[in-house]
């Protein structure tokens, strides 16, 4: 029981560290001035969605960690950690460095890692895999948003230099 609780706390801590980059690199006047599609979610949707998604991710990782040791479990956890890094990098690239195109590359990699993670998770815990699906869907939306913002703001003068 204590081991399970510690594993859950560690999982929440890892997700919290990832989330902290989103808290550190947030939308500012640069972002507000960018041209965005009409279907951009309202600002309030982002912290609500990410709060829920990060909790689901932490529970999924905890379920994996508590599963019997196997090659699938090890691979699942490795890909999970990789996608956490890609997730954290996106906020830094997009909001911190204002590099829309590079952030777009990162989010493509992130979505690929999430899809791989879901496939691997399903070999260990069906529940853990399903807990990652909303995250994958939200990141797919974020990818489309990132790509559209890049398209709307690129041109003779790079939007990343505004």
Model-derived regions: residue spans:
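N-terminal signal-anchor transmembrane alpha helix
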Residues: 2-24
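Membrane-helix boundary connector in multi-pass membrane proteins
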Residues: 94-99, 115-130
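Cytosolic, membrane-interface loops and tails of multi-pass inner-membrane proteins
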Residues: 25-42, 149-162
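Hydrophobic alpha-helical segments of small multi-pass membrane proteins
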Residues: 77-90, 104-117, 132-139
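Membrane-interface loop-to-helix entry segments
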Residues: 43-55, 99-110
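Core segments of transmembrane alpha-helices
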Residues: 50-63, 84-86, 109-113
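Membrane interfacial helix-start motif at the N-side
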Residues: 34-52, 93-94
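Terminal transmembrane helical module of multi-pass membrane proteins
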Residues: 124-162
């Amino acid at each position: 029981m204590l081991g399970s609780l510690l594993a859950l706390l560690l999982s929440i801590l890892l997700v919290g560290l990832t989330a902290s980059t989103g808290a550190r690199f947030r939308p500012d006047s640069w972002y507000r001035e960018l041209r965005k599609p009409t279907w951009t979610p309202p600002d309030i949707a982002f912290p609500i969605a990410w709060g829920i998604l990060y909790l689901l991710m932490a529970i999924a990782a905890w379920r994996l960690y508590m599963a019997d040791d196997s090659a699938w479990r090890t691979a699942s956890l490795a890909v999970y950690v990789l996608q956490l890094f890609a997730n954290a990098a996106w906020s830094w690239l997009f909001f911190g460095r204002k590099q829309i195109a590079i952030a777009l590359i990162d989010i493509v990699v992130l979505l690929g890692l999430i899809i791989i993670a879901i496939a691997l998770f399903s070999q260990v815990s069906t529940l853990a895999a399903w807990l990652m699906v909303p995250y994958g869907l939200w990141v797919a939306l974020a990818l489309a948003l990132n790509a559209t913002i890049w398209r709307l703001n690129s041109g003779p003068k790079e939007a990343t230099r505004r």
